[in-house]
């Protein structure tokens, strides 16, 4: 039973953010899973924030790894409705992309509009980079998320 629950959770995680080139980072295929700290939250815990899914990965990357991650993320960002990026010394240190999403209401299984977000934050450290990559989906607007993260 527990194994079935874990398998279901894995399928939900994959389907929640399918279609993004950055997915190999979340799946531990670009950065070894042993170097990644992952957080995954869904359901009622996120309701006060108008989100359905929150998934983040944190890790330390080499310059080559960061370059690959940035290329994947920027390619995904081409399809975004809203984009915010910041560079420091030629390195992408902040990115926030908002995509429109069709999600299904759990109550009626009817399509409803929502948002999907990909966020990147990079902190340079001597010869490596501390990286946080976040995927979120829900009804929260960009302004609401900005307020949430300010507090």
Model-assigned labels for residue ranges:
Residues 53-112:
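Mature extracytoplasmic domains of secretory-pathway proteins
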Residues 127-151:
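C-terminal partner/receptor-binding element of secreted or periplasmic proteins
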């Amino acid at each position: 039973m527990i194994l079935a629950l874990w398998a279901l959770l894995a399928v939900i995680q994959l389907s929640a953010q399918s279609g993004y080139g950055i997915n190999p980072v979340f799946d531990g295929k670009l950065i070894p899973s042993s170097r990644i700290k992952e957080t995954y939250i869904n359901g009622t815990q996120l309701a006060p924030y108008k989100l359905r899914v929150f998934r983040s990965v944190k890790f330390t990357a080499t310059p080559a790894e960061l370059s690959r991650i940035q290329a994947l993320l920027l390619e995904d960002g081409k399809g975004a409705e809203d984009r915010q990026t910041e560079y420091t010394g030629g390195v992408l240190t902040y990115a926030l992309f908002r995509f429109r999403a069709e999600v299904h209401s759990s109550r009626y299984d009817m399509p409803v509009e929502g948002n999907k977000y990909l966020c990147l934050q990079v902190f340079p450290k001597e010869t490596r980079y501390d990286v946080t990559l976040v995927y979120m989906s829900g009804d929260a607007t960009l302004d609401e998320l900005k307020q949430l993260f300010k507090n």
